[in-house]
């Protein structure tokens, strides 16, 4: 299907708005005040010494801006930014090709760095420490080792699973930064900025309700804003108010606590199938038909933060808050 000029213009406008949502400098990056101050010092020091920034590991829950922050670092350093992921690195040749293409001072960003295969991870060690690649060529009987010099570069790794990063890899990062959940005040500023980008008004009461449902996460806040905006455009002449937001959030099955259907399925399973626990994560995953990694990375961080569950050596346990949520007085 061919797009006419009007359609192409609309798509271009949408892309531009999406781009404008993403901050491009540390000054524009909202929240994470202490982290920004520290990172700013590191960047200024590296530029003053005309050196590459030390390798940086960023960790924290999904949706807090790890990729955006990595892009900002490259922009602040005025260097090229290259991106890949741990899952995409299936063979040693993939990493060798990527590293060999780097220029002086480049930032190489590896998302989900905890998913790097061990054999590929080990190639990074000499690259990070000495800016060299040691490669073994040939067959089992006739092996030949060659060394390739690399220009100084900065590796930025991002992970939602800090504990899964091996000690040898973790120790090679000179800088390690943690992204924390955003405060309600910070999320208000982010949503207000988003409303300006989209030229869509939002009243104060609706703003606060949206913040409550954003789970301390900018990505969720912006996604909810866009979905409510869809309803406002169709049913309310583009105005986001309490009435239209309630309709949208009800359709999206997101309650006042920020819990959605997936959260309720998890918590209901924990209470009804396993009597509140303790129960192993694999049993919960099998019961609700979900991957263990998805539960650990997507569901549980917020449920733990808000006090709906606890992790113990014996397994997951539902808290009194969860039983109250389901109006069950039989608290184990």
From Swiss-Prot:
Binding site for Mg(2+): 67
E.C. number: 3.6.4.-
Catalytic activity: ATP + H2O = ADP + phosphate + H(+)
Region feature (Small ATPAse domain (RuvB-S)): 183-253
An annotated GO BP: DNA recombination
InterPro entries: AAA+_ATPase, AAA_lid_4, DNA_helicase_Holl-junc_RuvB, P-loop_NTPase, RuvB-like_N, RuvB_C, WH-like_DNA-bd_sf, WH_DNA-bd_sf
Localization per record: Cytoplasm
Gene3D superfamilies according to UniProt: 1.10.8.60, P-loop containing nucleotide triphosphate hydrolases, Winged helix-like DNA-binding domain superfamily/Winged helix DNA-binding domain
Record's GO cellular component terms: cytoplasm; Holliday junction resolvase complex
GO molecular function: ATP binding; ATP hydrolysis activity; four-way junction DNA binding; four-way junction helicase activity
Origin species: Phytoplasma mali (strain AT)
Function summary: The RuvA-RuvB-RuvC complex processes Holliday junction (HJ) DNA during genetic recombination and DNA repair, while the RuvA-RuvB complex plays an important role in the rescue of blocked DNA replication forks via replication fork reversal (RFR). RuvA specifically binds to HJ cruciform DNA, conferring on it an open structure. The RuvB hexamer acts as an ATP-dependent pump, pulling dsDNA into and through the RuvAB complex. RuvB forms 2 homohexamers on either side of HJ DNA bound by 1 or 2 RuvA tetramers; 4 subunits per hexamer contact DNA at a time.
Name of this chain's protein: Holliday junction branch migration complex subunit RuvB
Subunit details: Homohexamer. Forms an RuvA(8)-RuvB(12)-Holliday junction (HJ) complex. HJ DNA is sandwiched between 2 RuvA tetramers; dsDNA enters through RuvA and exits via RuvB. An RuvB hexamer assembles on each DNA strand where it exits the tetramer. Each RuvB hexamer is contacted by two RuvA subunits (via domain III) on 2 adjacent RuvB subunits; this complex drives branch migration. In the full resolvosome a probable DNA-RuvA(4)-RuvB(12)-RuvC(2) complex forms which resolves the HJ.
UniProt keyword annotation of DNA repair present: yes
